[in-house]
Amino acid sequence: MLPTLNAPVGGESNYTNKIAPVGMHLARIYQIIDLGTTEQTGQFGGKKRKVQILFELPLETAIFDPEKGEQPFYARNMYTLSMHEKSTLRKDVHSIEGKTLTEDEAKKYNVFSLIGRECMVNIIHKQSGDKTFANIQTITPLPKGMVCPPAVNPPLVFSTQQPDMVVFRTLPEFVQDKIKLSDEFIAYMNAEMSANYPANKPTPTPIPTFTIENDVKPSDFDWMQGDQEDPTKLPF
């Protein structure tokens, strides 16, 4: 059963040695990663909740790892989790769904329901310093009658509010590091800690102490003086 990821109604690029080619491509959504709410930098900084969506391009393949053979290229979009009428996420959801959502539909929309959905993506290349990025410029519905080849990559979703730690450990380390800083993931981990170590947990009974007196006086050993073979001189 899919977890729920609703975006409120109201207001990036990947670099590898081989990047997805320019042009319009058949695509399938195969990863939706909720990165949680973190502090953002830049002109529009502040705390924002982000979600990363990865698109598999089944007709565009290359050898990235000789041991795995040919694999499809992928493209990635990073969204602010918002279904405001002017948000990029809502615009792309409309494109994939092939219809305009009502305000009520947008408010209840489960972003994770996009997993496995097919569409067309238009990719452009953008230069930044000495690196070239493959960016998704537009997303459009799959044309009627067009069939998308079977998926190559397994579908994967991750929620910071209902985290599956098995899935979490499969994510790239830099993605894990982002998630660990999110408000939602921190709150979840704190709740888990409280459940395992409740505040009202009984305090263990302290171990009693045994103090050895060091201020021994010579008179304490008076009974040891004299003939110890005579039992009448023992203190008992």
Question: Residue ranges of each PLM-predicted region?
Answer:
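Short beta-rich binding modules
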Residues: 1-236
